[in-house]
């Protein structure tokens, strides 16, 4: 009887808690050292403030053009926005620092193929057609939502027509509403309609106690990224709060996804939650997070928020990161990482196995 009882108990446990039925595993990646191909003659990039992909797996990177004087003696500063085909060949480019937002930061491609960019040294976001034509701008270049109207002024977090060093944006494919991570100077998500009219906002500066407690709808410091899931939820990087906060479109808080650091100390000066992207399957079973604090890409089970695997380490070799800053995922599940500071490159990580 005893063996039969044990077998029945095991069967009951397996029925109630089937560990393998819904277990999520992480895919494996390898660096694609052949991507991108050589840039046009004499081109050189500065810090790459963002990377984004199109439905056709073309890749855009945004270039801050901040090369050194020595580099200017031998090279040409590449344009601000560079477009690659899936094989890594340059197929288009436009922009310079006089037209794009200052310290260009983040990019997003909407359903019509338009390219959106922000800038963490400016007060605007911009929308470009694929041929480089400027279609829309929200905010005024050099006019900040701060106490004195300058970049260094304390953020007011209130303006309906101004921003303060926005970090990124996402466009709702259903109605064209624009959600802005605002940003380095403010502590909010600002929402505009498809024509740029202000609709609503949420978020404010968090106290240290609120940051340590994971309080909803407040931000430790930089509101560093924003993304929308297929379910219509808004994912926001609370970078120094070491978490991704998830909201409904009206700002109602849904949950925290912690990205812990080794010390557990909060707020975290460097922060861990730098950028997010989703796996390309309809359910978006995986969430990818760029952790600039450890120079790693984390692969998370989307439903539970559990970190399944990570890749990357500090360094300059292929597959390493030097200020890994933003990431994007294409339709095949390949991951692209753009680096700022002295990294100044984009790397492709090819999916080679897994779910």
Question: Model regions: which residues?
Answer:
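Positively charged n-region of N-terminal signal peptides that target proteins for export
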Residues: 1-4
């Amino acid at each position: 009887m005893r063996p039969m009882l044990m077998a029945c108990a095991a069967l009951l446990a397996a029925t109630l808690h089937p560990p393998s039925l819904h277990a999520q595993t992480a895919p494996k990646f390898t660096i694609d050292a052949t991507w991108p191909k050589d840039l046009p003659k004499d081109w050189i990039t500065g810090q790459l403030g963002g990377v984004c992909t199109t439905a056709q797996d073309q890749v855009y990177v945004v270039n801050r053009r901040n090369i050194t004087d020595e580099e200017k003696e031998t090279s040409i500063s590449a344009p601000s926005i560079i477009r690659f085909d899936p094989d890594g060949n340059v197929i288009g480019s436009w922009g310079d620092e006089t037209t794009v937002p200052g310290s260009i930061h983040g990019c997003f491609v909407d359903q019509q193929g338009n390219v959106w960019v922000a800038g963490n040294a400016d007060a605007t976001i911009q929308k470009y057609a694929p041929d480089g034509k400027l279609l829309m701008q929200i905010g005024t270049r050099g006019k900040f939502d701060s106490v004195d109207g300058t970049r260094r002024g304390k953020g007011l977090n209130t303006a309906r027509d101004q921003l303060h060093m926005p970090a990124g944006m996402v466009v709702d494919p259903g109605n064209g509403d624009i959600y802005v991570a605002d940003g380095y100077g403010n502590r909010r998500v600002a929402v505009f309609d498809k024509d740029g009219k202000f609709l609503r906002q949420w978020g404010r500066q968090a106290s240290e106690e609120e940051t340590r407690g994971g309080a909803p709808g407040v931000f430790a410091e930089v509101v560093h990224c924003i993304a929308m899931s297929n379910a219509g939820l808004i994912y926001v990087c609370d970078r120094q709060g070491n978490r991704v906060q998830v909201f409904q479109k009206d700002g109602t808080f849904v949950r925290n996804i912690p990205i812990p650091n080794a010390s557990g100390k909060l707020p975290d000066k460097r922060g861990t939650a730098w950028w997010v992207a989703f796996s390309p399957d309809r359910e978006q079973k995986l969430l990818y997070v760029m952790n600039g604090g450890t120079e790693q890409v984390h692969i998370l089970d989307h439903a539970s928020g559990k970190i399944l695997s990570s890749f990357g380490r500090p360094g300059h070799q292929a597959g390493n990161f030097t200020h890994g800053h933003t990431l994007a995922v294409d339709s095949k599940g390949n991951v692209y990482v753009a680096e700022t500071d002295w990294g100044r490159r984009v790397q492709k990580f090819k999916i080679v196995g897994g779910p």
